[in-house]
Amino acid sequence: MSWNFNDERPIYLQLIEQIQLRIVSGVYKVGGKLPSVREMASDASVNPNTMQKALTELERTGLVFSQRTSGRFITEDSNMIKVIRNGLAKEQIEKFLYNMEKIGYTKQETIQLVEIISKEMK
């Protein structure tokens, strides 16, 4: 999974979202240890201070926690991860519906089209 950034929002906020996505998708395992700040910053091609800022914010939310000599770990709170997963999905759906509306689809037409395409993909 590559790290993709745009110029519309601060990088650290995009890092937070992408780390959350990696957690809910299983790239980073629940209860598992995260790579070091430097390693993650290198992988994402960002400044380590920017990565540190994102990880500090994730710690503040409780999704990630530090153990002094062992590094950072992902919470095992499945409810928290489910809430984050649903939040990420909601954002994607809202963007999708907004874009479909921009090209002239009503919500009902969009739902019908999604159902048709979903059946075709099976």
Regions found by a protein language model. Name each.
Residues M1-K33, E39, G87, E91-K122:
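Extreme N-terminal segment that seeds HTH/winged-HTH DNA-binding domains in transcriptional regulators
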Residues V24, T56, E76:
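Alpha-helical and His/Cys-centered functional microenvironments
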Residues K33-F65:
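N-terminal helix-turn-helix
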Residues L34, S66-I74, S78-N79:
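Short, Lys/Arg-rich nucleic-acid/phosphate-binding segment
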Residues E39, Q52-A54, T69, F73, ...:
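Hydrophobic alpha-helical segments, especially transmembrane helices
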Residues S42, D77-S78, K119-E120:
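Short Asp/Glu-rich motifs
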Residues P48, T61-V64, G71-F73, I116, ...:
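A general secondary-structure boundary signal
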Residues M80-R85:
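Short, charged/polar, Gly/Pro-enriched secondary-structure boundary elements
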